[in-house]
Amino acid sequence: MQPIPIVTIVALAVAIIIAIVVWSIVIIEYRKILRQRKIDRLIDRLIERAEDSGNESEGEISALVEMGVEMGHHAPWDVDDL
């Protein structure tokens, strides 16, 4: 084969590999964002119920604990989802 088709095939293979890596990173980050939104919704619902009833909902706390979230200071300005 001549050098031009070989270079073209190699460049195409490299481009495909780069695209797979980039989209894999995008999917991983998207899942992190979705998980964080779910956690934020649970915390907001927990706070709302605590304000309404005066005590916290054990079911939602256990759901947060299963996800590995510690309860404590909920600071909206401490968002690290970039």
Swiss-Prot record:
Extracellular topological intervals: 1-7
Free-text comment about domains: The N-terminus and transmembrane domains are required for self-oligomerization and proper virion budding, whereas the cytoplasmic domain is required for CD4 degradation. The cytoplasmic domain is composed of 2 amphipathic alpha helix that form a U-shape.
Assembly, per entry: Homopentamer. Interacts with host CD4 and BRTC; these interactions induce proteasomal degradation of CD4. Interacts with host BST2; this interaction leads to the degradation of host BST2. Interacts with host FBXW11. Interacts with host AP1M1; this interaction plays a role in the mistrafficking and subsequent degradation of host BST2. Interacts with host RANBP2; this interaction allows Vpu to down-regulate host BLM sumoylation.
A GO molecular-function annotation: monoatomic cation channel activity
Record's comment on post-translational modification: Phosphorylated by host CK2. This phosphorylation is necessary for interaction with human BTRC and degradation of CD4.
Chain segments annotated as transmembrane: 8-28
Function text: Enhances virion budding by targeting host CD4 and Tetherin/BST2 to proteasome degradation. Degradation of CD4 prevents any unwanted premature interactions between viral Env and its host receptor CD4 in the endoplasmic reticulum. Degradation of antiretroviral protein Tetherin/BST2 is important for virion budding, as BST2 tethers new viral particles to the host cell membrane. Mechanistically, Vpu bridges either CD4 or BST2 to BTRC, a substrate recognition subunit of the Skp1/Cullin/F-box protein E3 ubiquitin ligase, induces their ubiquitination and subsequent proteasomal degradation.
Keyword tags: AIDS, Apoptosis, Host membrane, Host-virus interaction, Inhibition of host innate immune response by virus, Inhibition of host tetherin by virus, Ion channel, Ion transport, Membrane, Phosphoprotein, Transmembrane, Transmembrane helix, Transport, Viral immunoevasion
Activity control note: Ion channel activity is inhibited by hexamethylene amiloride in vitro.
Name of the protein this chain belongs to: Protein Vpu
Membrane topology (Cytoplasmic): 29-82
Primary localisation category: host cell
Naturally occurring in which organism (per UniProt): Human immunodeficiency virus type 1 group M subtype B (isolate BH8) (HIV-1)
GO process annotations (BP): receptor catabolic process; symbiont-mediated suppression of host innate immune response; symbiont-mediated suppression of host type I interferon-mediated signaling pathway; symbiont-mediated-mediated suppression of host tetherin activity; viral release from host cell
Membrane topology summary: Single-pass type I membrane protein
